[in-house]
Amino acid sequence: MGAESLVAGLAIIGIVIVVSALLSGLVDRSGLPQVAVFIFIGAALGPAGFGVFDMTLTSPVLRVVATLSLTMVLFTDAVTLNIKEVRRRAGLAFRMLGPGTILCAALTALVAWWLLGIPPALAAILGAALASTDPVLLRGLLRRRDISLVTRQALQLESGLNDVVLLPIVVVAIFLSGQHELPSASFPKIGFGLFILGPGAGIAIGLMAVAALDLIRKRIGVRRDYESLYSLGVALSAYAAAEAVHGSGFLSAFAAGITIAALDVELCDCFIEYGGVTAEMLLLFTFVIFGSSLIWTGFYGLDTRTVIFAAFAILIRVPVYLISMIGSDVDKHGRLLIAWFGPSGLSSLLLILLPVFAGVPGSDQLFRICALIVLISVVVHGSTPMLFARLLGQHEPEAPPKPEAPNEPRPLPVLELVQPTGTQSITLEELDQLQKSGEQVILLDVRTERSRDTSDSQAEGSIRMPPENVVMQARELALPKEAWLIAYCA
């Protein structure tokens, strides 16, 4: 049985990687919700399909995968934040988190208590979980270039910061739901572990990690792709360190990510380039696990009150965020998009699993309600990028190709002039040789916005090309296909 479980696990991991790679282009162009694809893959592999595996709330594997996923979600949220942008947009961040996230959570909890008769502590957990926005669903919308910069920044700030606001609510409510078993002296200890030990351990691990990496960089050097794996190791180490001292491992992972984001821009960019893909694979793998059977429990015992509550939980965001955006510099269309697009997804499911793992009575009901709302949100919010693309005319006509100049004899073959040091790099001496030989050479500044914040200097004659949607940008810039395109990112 152990061997069969291992084979099934490896098969699922392989399917996630292969399918996500094959569908990446289709998802980007069509706006198709990637999450929905993996939920249905899970359904096909689950008991209703091929019966490869059946996951329940008591499965030990679920706890391991959920813990890893929530750790990666919080760390990724933190490490991808642009700290300078957060400071610059502090007022906007407050609007998104204060009147926005917290008020949505409070109103949802109130209606859950009033309409569904859920105890106050459990209602608070449900409200907080449903107020969390899903990073995977949100990523597809943030990649669109026809959304204004301030709108993207607002959604990024909310996605990066709202989980760290909601997680303490969930943790405190879990303890309150079982407070009859806890002495009053336990609450200061719980608060100390949650708000001091957890973040403190994360900051300490982050500081040591950045210092060690900086030392090794200067003396030996570190490969860029391995720096992303290094950051993943930091996330897991921060979680373990906090749990070892009875702190919150999840808040520790977030604190470690914030520390890295504040101190080491290059490591953050490495994580976005390489580690971010690894983390996303884990999150998609988690969707497959939920899709096997767990998420479909949302239809069990469905009644009119639950349907009304689900509609309220999804729609309450619209008036709350429209009001919170009054007086901001976000335009009307941006406000409507922000107010509408608050998808519930993996983050909501992971937060709602915390009381399940803690053995809180009635938490299985919370999971079923949350699963139903996540399914609705995947359909409703997941189709938003696709509808948005159609409304704004995503498929812009391609610029006609420039007439090619007649071939002219070149003084020397390029291969005789340049012996590349690698398939992805070129030295300054080789660049100089190319330019002197008469070759058409175009320098591309492909630094991320975060990297440019440290220095706005740009190589003379280079063209700015952010590292997103590069094919579309190349067409817009009419870059000649026969030219040498040399990109630099530092």
Annotate each predicted stretch with a short phrase.
Residues 29, 131, 407-409, 476:
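Generic N-terminal simple sequence motifs
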Residues 46, 223, 295, 407, ...:
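Alpha-helix initiation/capping motif
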Residues 1-400:
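Transmembrane helical cores of multi-pass secondary ion antiporters/exchangers
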Residues 281, 304, 424, 455-457:
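Hydrophobic alpha-helical segments and helix-packing faces
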